[in-house]
Amino acid sequence: MFRGANAVSLDAKGRISMPARYREELMARSAGQLIVTIDAMDPCLCIYPLPEWELIETKLRELPSLREETRRLQRLLIGNAVDLELDGSGRFLIPPRLREHASLDKHAMLVGQLNKFQLWNEDAWIAIANADLAAIKQQPGDLPGELRDLIL
């Protein structure tokens, strides 16, 4: 499982070094094979170990293909998906069009989301994290029941 927010840097070629604490698990789970795609809801990228992504592809394939929402989601997620591989130094290359989608520059945040990572522009991550915290503090009663019952 992937947890925590990690400051990472993109080099001039758009490569990121995967934090060492995740490398062993990624090698065990997916032999360093990753999929990166856009996040359909937020201005960030999602990075999945290949087996996790294959589960998503299976679910997407099972959705009713006559629904416009299904086709739209498939176009966004699958159409923007790119295969990546950790190199011998634990680095991976983010393609330019995906870097552009997430407004990635030299400073980024790699955020563990249990079965995947999100990759954010550092300033965008700080802004969304602060906004999320403020929203929860302002309206704690608006949480769905399953989240209110979550023991933290």
Swiss-Prot record:
<keyword id="KW-0804">Transcription</keyword>
<feature type="domain" description="SpoVT-AbrB 2">
    <location>
        <begin position="81"/>
        <end position="124"/>
    </location>
</feature>
<dbReference type="Pfam" id="PF02381">
    <property type="entry name" value="MraZ"/>
</dbReference>
<dbReference type="GO" id="GO:0009295">
    <property type="term" value="C:nucleoid"/>
</dbReference>
<dbReference type="GO" id="GO:0003700">
    <property type="term" value="F:DNA-binding transcription factor activity"/>
</dbReference>
<comment type="similarity">
    <text>Belongs to the MraZ family.</text>
</comment>
<dbReference type="InterPro" id="IPR020603">
    <property type="entry name" value="MraZ_dom"/>
</dbReference>
<dbReference type="InterPro" id="IPR003444">
    <property type="entry name" value="MraZ"/>
</dbReference>
<dbReference type="InterPro" id="IPR035644">
    <property type="entry name" value="MraZ_C"/>
</dbReference>
<keyword id="KW-0805">Transcription regulation</keyword>
<keyword id="KW-0963">Cytoplasm</keyword>
<dbReference type="InterPro" id="IPR038619">
    <property type="entry name" value="MraZ_sf"/>
</dbReference>
<feature type="domain" description="SpoVT-AbrB 1">
    <location>
        <begin position="5"/>
        <end position="52"/>
    </location>
</feature>
<dbReference type="GO" id="GO:0005737">
    <property type="term" value="C:cytoplasm"/>
</dbReference>
<dbReference type="GO" id="GO:2000143">
    <property type="term" value="P:negative regulation of DNA-templated transcription initiation"/>
</dbReference>
<protein>
    <recommendedName>
        <fullName>Transcriptional regulator MraZ</fullName>
    </recommendedName>
</protein>
<dbReference type="InterPro" id="IPR037914">
    <property type="entry name" value="SpoVT-AbrB_sf"/>
</dbReference>
<dbReference type="GO" id="GO:0000976">
    <property type="term" value="F:transcription cis-regulatory region binding"/>
</dbReference>
<comment type="subunit">
    <text>Forms oligomers.</text>
</comment>
<keyword id="KW-0677">Repeat</keyword>
<dbReference type="InterPro" id="IPR035642">
    <property type="entry name" value="MraZ_N"/>
</dbReference>
<keyword id="KW-0238">DNA-binding</keyword>
<dbReference type="InterPro" id="IPR007159">
    <property type="entry name" value="SpoVT-AbrB_dom"/>
</dbReference>
